[in-house]
Regions:
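Pol beta-like nucleotidyltransferase catalytic core
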Residues: 1-64, 70-77, 81-131
Length: 131
């Protein structure tokens, strides 16, 4: 997710944001100057395999930002599987037809509550604005 987009659109403080390690201490310092920030877990551990249920229990929906967004392939990382395992509603900023593929594989999504037409948008930036 583009943190600058979140900050410019006043979305940074609207929920919980998870991210990996910063590339440098300077990046962390810059981010901490821009907004109140709370780090509730160490960034020295790879949390890819962990599912933190309290995070899902304290939020209404997950915005999943996939690692690789490419129009030529369908890529799904652990990021999409975490809310699925937790039974948590989600929107995915990923490749075209990610939701469609999940449905084809038998997964149920939250289409009764979420307009999933964004899944058909091939332009990453248009999809980000829609979301």
């Amino acid at each position: 997710m583009d943190f600058v987009f979140l900050i410019k659109n006043n979305l940074f403080d609207k929920g919980k944001i998870s991210l990996g390690k910063f590339d440098s201490d300077e990046e962390y310092e810059e981010l901490s100057k821009m907004t109140p920030i709370e780090i509730d877990r160490t960034l020295d551990i790879n949390w890819a395999a962990n599912i933190e249920l309290p995070d899902y229990e304290s939020t209404f929906i997950s915005l999943v930002t996939e690692t690789l967004i490419d129009t030529s392939i369908l890529f799904m990382s652990e990021k999409i599987w975490k809310p699925i395992v937790a039974g948590h509603p989600f929107i995915v900023l990923g490749n075209v037809n990610t939701i469609s593929y999940l449905k084809e594989q038998g997964y149920k999504t939250f289409d009764r509550w979420i307009d999933e037409s964004y899944d058909l948008e091939p332009d990453h930036h248009k999809k980000l604005i829609w979301l």
